[in-house]
């Protein structure tokens, strides 16, 4: 819970800075790349959690990573600040929170669309258009297949689920029949 509060504080500051400089998307891309490098490299994560490494050594490791990733100056300074404050371990949570706050700032939603069968592009675009019209926001859908739905679509937007799957409809009919 503490890490969530810390992540939110850092992410919020970076979103505000990105918004002021019109660099929200660039920051997002750079943070995803750096976070991906950390996620894929256990030794790198261990180095930042290891007290045997001095603060200067950790800063140099981060500088090398920043140079390889060709991060912007603002993201580079942000990452070095995380090293200074010993918050690099919070990077995954910061990036996740940044994405959510950046989407809110930009008016973007990322619904999860689950169907029983794979959708073609025209079907995804039709659902996307309907959601954009309903929400008034830009929609960036994520689509997955779950054959247990039998048919229909389940759309999850944050905490709200729109379930028009055959599986759910059959379950409702079953409940009605059992209750009499």
Curated annotation (Swiss-Prot):
One of its GO terms (molecular function) is proton-transporting ATP synthase activity, rotational mechanism. It is found in: Cell inner membrane. Coiled coil: none annotated. Pfam families: OSCP (PF00213). Its main location: membrane. It is a peripheral membrane protein. GO terms for cellular component: plasma membrane; proton-transporting ATP synthase complex. SUPFAM superfamilies: N-terminal domain of the delta subunit of the F1F0-ATP synthase. InterPro entries: ATP_synth_OSCP/delta_N_sf, ATPase_OSCP/dsu. The keyword Cell inner membrane applies. Keywords: ATP synthesis, Cell inner membrane, Cell membrane, CF(1), Hydrogen ion transport, Ion transport, Membrane, Transport. The keyword Ion transport applies. F(1)F(0) ATP synthase produces ATP from ADP in the presence of a proton or sodium gradient. F-type ATPases consist of two structural domains, F(1) containing the extramembraneous catalytic core and F(0) containing the membrane proton channel, linked together by a central stalk and a peripheral stalk. During catalysis, ATP synthesis in the catalytic domain of F(1) is coupled via a rotary mechanism of the central stalk subunits to proton translocation. F-type ATPases have 2 components, F(1) - the catalytic core - and F(0) - the membrane proton channel. F(1) has five subunits: alpha(3), beta(3), gamma(1), delta(1), epsilon(1). F(0) has three main subunits: a(1), b(2) and c(10-14). The alpha and beta chains form an alternating ring which encloses part of the gamma chain. F(1) is attached to F(0) by a central stalk formed by the gamma and epsilon chains, while a peripheral stalk is formed by the delta and b chains. NCBIfam families: ATP_synt_delta, PRK05758.2-2, PRK05758.2-4. Belongs to the ATPase delta chain family. This is ATP synthase subunit delta. It comes from Trichlorobacter lovleyi (strain ATCC BAA-1151 / DSM 17278 / SZ) (Geobacter lovleyi). The gene is atpH.
